[in-house]
């Protein structure tokens, strides 16, 4: 069994978390685990989107994309 700890949240937050856990039929601990994993996934996707956006704004990448687009019509393949 894993160790546990206590966290302090407002009564309102506790009640909201308890209601969400109850609706899903899981414990508050399981709900918090799911929410933490979801936040981590969202952060990863956000970082990937930001990196992709930054990459597409550089002139070198736009130039390379233009070169690749030119090869589509060269009849070689």
Swiss-Prot record:
UniProt entry tagged with the keyword DNA-binding: yes
Gene Ontology terms, MF aspect: DNA binding
BP-aspect Gene Ontology terms: detoxification; positive regulation of growth
UniProt keywords, alphabetically: DNA-binding, Toxin-antitoxin system
Superkingdom in the source lineage: Bacteria
Keyword Metal-binding appears in the UniProt entry: no
Residue ranges of the region described as Disordered: 49-77
Its job: Antitoxin component of a type II toxin-antitoxin (TA) system. Upon expression in E.coli but not in M.smegmatis neutralizes the effect of cognate toxin MazF7.
Description of how the protein assembles with itself and partners: Forms a complex with cognate toxin MazF7.
Identification of the protein by name: Antitoxin MazE7
Record lineage: Bacteria, Bacillati, Actinomycetota, Actinomycetes, Mycobacteriales
Gene: mazE7
């Amino acid at each position: 069994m894993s160790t546990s700890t206590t966290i302090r949240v407002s009564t309102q937050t506790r009640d909201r978390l308890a209601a969400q856990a109850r609706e899903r039929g899981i414990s508050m601990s399981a709900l918090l685990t799911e929410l933490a994993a979801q936040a981590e996934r969202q952060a990863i996707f956000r970082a990937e989107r930001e990196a992709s956006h930054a990459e597409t704004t550089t002139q070198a990448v736009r130039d390379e994309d233009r070169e690749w687009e030119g090869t589509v019509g060269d009849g070689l393949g």
